[in-house]
């Protein structure tokens, strides 16, 4: 059973991610946050398995969308898949010095999307009042930014 401390940390991390999503959505009218069905529909549109629906948070279009508008892609419309990584740490030179976790599904979706001509990128967001902002890094450029990388397994026992 998870400790109350780990539960508190999870809630805090979820709040930080929500704040980062809100910051991004308010700062860029080209961003849209699809619901679960919308994410699956986007993947279906690309011919990618729906199991990757949680491996991205937002879609960036070439046109502005309103927050309450249901996302409907126009025929041949280009878009990008965006995965948010957020922190409250002071990072004045984003994305430099950013520490984050990423799942195998995020990397696999990035690979498949890239093969289909769709950009997949991470949006590194700092919520610190003195360094609030964001930086996009395309998954194909990520290795150029990585200083160190390690594998961590998340295991569920039966």
Map each language-model feature to its residues.
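Acidic-basic catalytic patches of nuclease active cores, encompassing PD-(D/E)XK
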Residues: 1-54
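Conserved catalytic cores of phosphodiester-cleaving nucleases, focusing on short active-site segments
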Residues: 24, 58-60, 78-88
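Mg2+/Mn2+-dependent nuclease catalytic core
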Residues: 87-112
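Short, solvent-exposed loop/turn segments that connect beta-strands within catalytic domains
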Residues: 64-77, 93-94, 116-117, 130-133
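Active-site metal-binding core of divalent-cation-utilizing nuclease and nuclease-like domains
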Residues: 39-76
